[in-house]
């Protein structure tokens, strides 16, 4: 298993569902700077992360809904990490 070791100013974790997503962004000190439930749309996501885009990495769990988010991050040049929950 490979672990992500990149260092960033902000870290975004997403609990992604079909219609909603819970977004939490931490700064490099581990303090929460954003915690919000959003509609699962590119527009809502990009608006929420806009203030933190300078140095942000996005991560979500490998579920059936992750493809669009990975594609959006690639298009927007946002580092993206796909996590696998241990069994």
Please name every model-derived segment.
Residues 1-87:
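Phosphate- and other anionic-substrate recognition elements at nucleic-acid/protein interfaces
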């Amino acid at each position: 298993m490979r672990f992500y070791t990149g260092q960033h100013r902000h870290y975004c974790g997403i609990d992604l569902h079909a219609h909603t997503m819970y977004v939490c962004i931490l700064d490099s000190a581990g303090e929460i700077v954003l915690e919000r439930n959003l509609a699962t749309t590119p527009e809502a996501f990009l608006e929420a992360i806009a203030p933190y885009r300078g140095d942000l990495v996005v991560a979500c769990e490998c579920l059936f809904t992750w493809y669009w988010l990975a594609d959006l991050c690639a298009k927007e040049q946002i580092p993206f990490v796909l996590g696998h929950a241990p069994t």
